[in-house]
Amino acid sequence: WGRGVCPFHNEWYWSNGTGTVDGKIFGFNLGTGFGNTSQASENMLFYNGKYHKLGRVHFDLDTEYMKPWRLYDDEGRLDLTLTPCYDRTTRMKVLFVDNCCHQMFGGFSGRAVLDDGTVLQIDDLQAFAEHAVNNW
C-alpha cells in the first residue's frame, strides 16, 4: 500500500490497461515497489465484470527501455510481454529533487489465468508500463 509520506528514495514499476479479450472487457493493474506489499498488493485482473487477485508480480526489462518487457507473477497466472512503441520520459532535477520516469506505451501479449483456471490469451492489447525512480 502507498503511504502519505514517501521515503526520500522511491522506485516502482506499474502497469495498467483495459481492452477486450474474447469480446469481453478485460483489464489489469500491476505494480511493485510502491509501499509495503508484504500483506497486500494492487495486482489485479478484471474480466467480464469480476476481479481476480494476483500475488507478487515481477517486471523484467532491459536498460534499453524500448526492448520488450516481461511481466509475470510467482504463481504462474500471468505472463505478458510488452512490446513498446513509445517511451514517454519525464525528468525533473531541481536541488535535491531528482525524478525520472519512463512510461512505455505499446502492445501486451501473453496469457492470464483467472481464479477459476480459465486461461485468457492476450493479443496486442494496447496499454502502458512505467519505471519510476524518484528522490524527493
Where on the chain are the PLM-derived regions?
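Structured soluble/peripheral alpha/beta segments that form catalytic or ligand/cofactor-binding pockets
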Residues: 1-136
